């Protein structure tokens, strides 16, 4: 199970808007996509098609609204598109309910960010350090 290059770029940008870098690394740098890639072969296998369809639709929504791929949008516009997806205010056709995809994306991003580093995310235990868990 593998994402297309476009889906990977969209995923990378989306997870970094859900958990953006600040004084600590964001979701991408913390290994969330590594976690998700591993989980697509395991627990997320049943949701893989929804993930792929959602990422493709998220990018299509960005193209329809801004004539740019999601990964190329400004952070403000990425946040705007994600808010519209969260509330279901989309103008393109989605094969998965937009709000359901948003919920899946947020939940699995948080899982990867706060998971045990042995699961592929939370690189260098960054999120645990952030919350004071040693």
Question: What is the role of each PLM region?
Answer:
Residues 8-13, 17-21, 31-134:
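Mature-region segments of soluble proteins
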